[in-house]
Amino acid sequence: MASFTLDLLAQLPEAYQAFSPLIDILPLIPVFFLLLAFVWQASVGFR
């Protein structure tokens, strides 16, 4: 059982290799929302 778990964990990086570009972009999403808030406030005139 333990060796099966270790084998599964060893295969995970290969399984998620296709999502590598997505994982590079994910940390930028909060920055995008912060900038969106500034653009929104600028459009309504910083009420």
Swiss-Prot record:
Any one Pfam family match given in the protein's UniProt record, by short name: PsbK
SUPFAM superfamilies in the cross-refs: Photosystem II reaction center protein K, PsbK
GO biological process, one term: photosynthesis
Membrane-spanning segments: 19-39
Keyword Transmembrane among record annotations: yes
NCBIfam families given in the database record: PRK02553.1 (NF002715)
Family of this protein: Belongs to the PsbK family.
PANTHER family: PHOTOSYSTEM II REACTION CENTER PROTEIN K, PTHR35325
Protein name: Photosystem II reaction center protein K
Organism of derivation: Parasynechococcus marenigrum (strain WH8102)
Lineage: Bacteria, Bacillati, Cyanobacteriota, Cyanophyceae, Synechococcales
